[in-house]
Amino acid sequence: MVSGNNVTDRPQGPDSYARIALSLADQGWCVTPDFLAPRLIGELIGEAERIWNAGGFRHAGVGRDPDLHINPEVRTDHVRWLVPQAGSDAQRLYLHALEELRQAINRELYLGLFEFEGHLAIYTPGSYYRKHLDQFRGIGLRTVTCILYLNRDWVAEDGGQLRLYTDPDEPSRYEEILPLGGQLVTFLSARFLHEVLPARRQRISITGWFRQHGGLNI
């Protein structure tokens, strides 16, 4: 169990949140190493592995109710949605850090973000997620994507990179981001196509979105 009284367990502070917000305002995306302390990442990894071993994940779908369906040509990962009221101490510390980040982004970008929704995601060897946007067609509620990686000792040979297409006018221009444990990736959900390349070992993350009430265009 993680205690927030231990300074080594605490997430990065206000300066880090402000840097992320400024990067979103400047280029629309940001990569933050060591967003959470290693001990806290270890707790989250252990939780995800226990839930997986107990059969608590399900195949991820494409679309949103009532159009949600399984499409292995698009994605083959497994997910378990977070329930904040029933979350562990480690999850609550992470969600508290995201709340601080939400406020910092609202101060800088005036986006009116009001809540976070997210899930644990596990990619088994060979799993992938093809190129896509995080906003559903005609529904602009998901506004800022946040991905926290929960992987030990990841190297390029393990695959599973996040490929973020950083220029809509240049499809060949992209960043490939290794899913390093403790690293947080944030980007504007409506702006950037992205994909997860096939993983060669189990790959774990918490993926989620800050949402708006009315789906403003940004």
What are these regions (language model features)?
Residues 1-145, 149-184, 190-218:
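Fe(II)/2-oxoglutarate oxygenase catalytic core
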